[in-house]
Amino acid sequence: MLKQQSTLSLVMIAMFAALTAVGAFIKIPLPLVPFTLQIVFVFLAGCLLGGRNGFQSQLVYIGIGLVGLPVFTQGGGITYVLQPTFGYLIGFALAALVIGYMIDRVESPTKKHFIVANIIGLIIIYAVAVPYLYVALNVWLNMKSSWSHVFLVGFVNSIVADFCLAIASALLAERLYKVFRSARAIKLVQIEKENV
């Protein structure tokens, strides 16, 4: 039973890692920080997979990119940690963890729960990404940039769109959550029948 449940979880983790990779290539080029749809799948991973599995889906995505597969917006490889935007990827993993943890704590999450969780996840992403962007530009890339410039390109340019995506993802998650919960329930019934 445990083995079959973990197999289902692994499939979901792999699926959301792949979806996050796909989201990296649906982008609008902007200075330093391109706008992508990755964040949608981060929100959905947290909302639908829960804290642990949502977090793991983003770790898998990051791991695949760091070993060399070009799944990030600007390629892949271990040196990608030096990219100014790598902080967003760290933020993605932490956001999925916190979003999932918040949803996991509610027995029957509502639209409000998903929206609040996603907004908090969005805050976490930017809280990690903007300082990382500043340090990357000023320390190891030696591209002297003021906090105001970093705040503009790393936050102001994309926060409105990301906020809208957080709300839209929450509304979608509310509907999909019931489907995911039903699928898990059906799977458990099948497993119980097999064990009878």
From Swiss-Prot:
Keyword set, alphabetical order: Cell membrane, Membrane, Transmembrane, Transmembrane helix, Transport
Predominant cellular place of this UniProt entry's protein: membrane
Membrane topology: Multi-pass membrane protein
Single annotated GO MF: biotin transmembrane transporter activity
Pfam families: BioY
Gene3D superfamilies, per the entry: 1.10.1760.20
Positions of transmembrane segments: 8-28, 30-50, 59-79, 81-101, 114-134, 150-170
UniProt xrefs under InterPro entries: BioY (IPR003784)
Domain of life of the organism encoding this protein: Bacteria
Compartments, record wording: Cell membrane
GO CC terms in record: plasma membrane
Keyword Transmembrane: yes
Family under the similarity heading: Belongs to the BioY family.
Biological role stated in the UniProt entry: Probable biotin transporter.
Official protein name in the record: Probable biotin transporter BioY
